UniProtKB/Swiss-Prot annotation:
Keywords: Amino-acid biosynthesis, Aminotransferase, Histidine biosynthesis, Pyridoxal phosphate, Transferase. This is Histidinol-phosphate aminotransferase. SUPFAM superfamilies: PLP-dependent transferases. One of its GO terms (molecular function) is histidinol-phosphate transaminase activity. Its EC number is 2.6.1.9. The gene is hisC.
């Protein structure tokens, strides 16, 4: 069986470690955008009531038409601007990487940063380039970042905002400079 796995699974995938989430017991967990409190009973009841009318035996609308309309209205998004919906950021990160993946293309992000950027780049067969944040305050070292963009010519740049795991927000002027210098897509996650 080991020989079969070695033959079938790419070496770069075999070398990956599972994405480990430590037990949060006794900690204040701020990194996963989770509500540390339960939903109020009134909100739970309202949510469950809304489930009565759903066709749970059918796949949902793949375009999320109603969700897109609500987002456009709430956020003032023009109708000619596309929206891409997904089942959490991991799926969207993966969809974008797969969409641009070709031999030799690169994903660039900041380190330390969200571990899924590196992992999904590997899944998609892309090279990952991590650019270190400043060690004193975890801010973007803009000259180093711009040099990496020029040298590596990434197809995709991910910027977690606020950064995960450091929690800091990056200087908006630095982010604009990165977007202007990028030869490919820049995703602010």
């Amino acid at each position: 069986m080991i020989d079969l796995i070695t033959q079938l699974i790419r070496p770069d995938i075999r070398a990956l470690s599972a994405y480990h989430v430590p037990d949060p017991a006794g900690l204040i967990k701020l990194d996963a955008m989770e509500n540390p409190y339960g939903w109020p009973d009134t909100l739970k009841a309202e949510w469950l009531e809304g489930m009565h009318d759903l066709a749970l035996n059918r796949y949902p609308d793949p375009q999320g038409t109603a969700v897109q309309a609500a987002l456009r209205q709430a956020m003032g998004i023009p109708s000619d601007m596309g929206l891409l919906l997904g089942n959490g950021s991991d799926e969207l990160i993966q969809m974008l990487a797969i969409a641009v993946a070709q031999p030799g293309r690169k994903v660039l992000s900041l380190d330390p940063g969200f571990v899924m950027y590196r992992m999904i780049a590997c899944f998609a067969g892309m090279d990952y380039v991590g650019v270190p944040l400043r060690s004193d305050d975890f801010s973007i070292d803009l000259p180093v970042m711009l040099d990496a963009i020029e040298r590596e010519q990434p197809a995709l740049i991910y910027l977690a905002y606020p950064n995960n795991p450091t929690g800091n927000r990056f200087d908006s002027d630095d982010m604009v400079r990165i977007i202007e210098a990028a030869p490919g897509l820049v995703i602010v996650d």
